[in-house]
Amino acid sequence: MSSGGLLLLLGLLTLWMELTPVSSKNRPPFCNLLPEPGRCNAIVRAFYYNSRPRKCLEFPYGGCGGNANNFKTIEECQRTCAG
């Protein structure tokens, strides 16, 4: 197969992976929790998984408490809940 064909195949595979939804059976249950800012008053940038658009979104975290649907980075959220 030519390098152009391999590049096209790689592109199509990447597109397929992006468009294929993650099965909710493989997603931890806490990914379905609503974002919980916690009981403290700090304003920390955090991310949570939103099951409606099936993606990780930013929310203001208070710095303590909250629930498990709370991630420091969007990459961590995506690895855990979005696939």
From Swiss-Prot:
The keyword Aminoacyl-tRNA synthetase does not apply. Residues 1-24 form the signal peptide. Keywords: Disulfide bond, Metalloenzyme inhibitor, Metalloprotease inhibitor, Protease inhibitor, Secreted, Signal. The record marks N41, A42 as: Reactive bond for chymotrypsin. GO terms for cellular component: extracellular space. Gene3D superfamilies: Pancreatic trypsin inhibitor Kunitz domain. Disulfide bonds join C31-C81, C40-C64, C56-C77. Transmembrane segments: none annotated. InterPro entries: Kunitz_BPTI, Kunitz_BPTI_sf, Prtase_inh_Kunz-CS, TFPI/VKTCI-like. Residues 31-81 form the BPTI/Kunitz inhibitor domain. Pfam families: Kunitz_BPTI (PF00014). Expressed by the venom gland. The keyword ATP-binding does not apply. It is found in: Secreted. One of its GO terms (molecular function) is serine-type endopeptidase inhibitor activity. Shows weak binding and inhibition of MMP-2 and shows an activity in inhibiting migration and invasion of neuroblastoma. Negative results: does not inhibit chymotrypsin and trypsin. Does not inhibit vasopressin V2 receptor (V2R/AVPR2). PANTHER family: BPTI_KUNITZ INHIBITOR DOMAIN-CONTAINING PROTEIN, KUNITZ-TYPE PROTEASE INHIBITOR-RELATED. Belongs to the venom Kunitz-type family. This is Kunitz-type serine protease inhibitor PILP-2. It comes from Bungarus multicinctus (Many-banded krait).
